[in-house]
Amino acid sequence: MQNRNTFSWIKEQMTRSISVSIMIYVITRTAISNAYPIFAQQGYENPREATGRIVCANCHLANKPVDIEVPQAVLPDTVFEAVVRIPYDMQVKQVLANGKKGALNVGAVLILPEGFELAPPDRISPEMKEKIGKLSFQSYRPTKKNILVIGPVPGQKYSEITFPILSPDPATKKDVHFLKYPIYVGGNRGRGQIYPDGSKSNNTVYNATAAGIISKIVRKEKGGYEISIADASDGHQVVDIIPPGPELLVSEGESIKLDQPLTSNPNVGGFGQGDAEIVLQDPLRVQGLLFFLASVILAQIFLVLKKKQFEKVQLSEMNF
């Protein structure tokens, strides 16, 4: 009877431990999968360095294009679209964290001038909401409302991202002026090659950490490899760990050099950055321009009428 109770207690504890482990795994995986923009937010006070380089390039090493489209000029307290395009071949698949192949995700950071910010929902038109879809934007910092981040989101659906932006009003914000301002954007497609702590992801090439002869290659049960290298200098064994994902390029007995690629480079994505300019236009200046154009048109009309009147007078004098 005592043995049966002991067995039941052990079984209950094992079931509870397994349940807790599963919950921790699910929570961790969810946090990691949704934390890519957070990497930059946690590590850098400002996503744009003094050199002009956007910090996302520290983890996404391949250079790819990105495009931004904004109006040439906007009026104060006006909602407008900033459209970011992140082009890539929709047919390609990327290496996922588990080593399997999957669709690419995309993300973007939009650095607006001081005073510009994400438009509130009640100011966004139905047409613009339809373009935005189910995207959820967030500020880079609570104190930096002019810097917006988005992602990772499915690339096949959101390779073109529409940001709803509200322009500032210098009448209420004294530090904002009617000027031409720069806008900076960074956009990535696919996973990065380096994590913020400096470690490699499985979405990059792995190189030999020693020169010598490959003495043994062990294929791990969950994917990846352990490559044993007999060091050329003293013969001691150096083991390089290859995670699931990259394809192996070497074989046992092969002589290799230091930093020689052991795997292919599975990365199909990359990061790009661009910029644009926008003018915060003074309404009074626009009104003055319209008044000037109207006066020029009226002057032209009066000139034509005066010319016709003069021609009539000349014609009548000739007939007389």
UniProtKB/Swiss-Prot annotation:
Membrane topology annotation: Single-pass membrane protein
Species name: Platanus occidentalis
SUPFAM superfamilies referenced in this protein's UniProt entry, alphabetically: Cytochrome f subunit of the cytochrome b6f complex, transmembrane anchor (SSF103431), Cytochrome f, large domain (SSF49441), Rudiment single hybrid motif (SSF51246)
Signal sequence range: 1-35
Subunit field text: The 4 large subunits of the cytochrome b6-f complex are cytochrome b6, subunit IV (17 kDa polypeptide, petD), cytochrome f and the Rieske protein, while the 4 small subunits are PetG, PetL, PetM and PetN. The complex functions as a dimer.
PROSITE patterns for the chain: CYTF
Cofactor (UniProt): heme
Cellular component, GO annotation: chloroplast thylakoid membrane
Family: Belongs to the cytochrome f family.
Name listed for the protein in its UniProt record: Cytochrome f
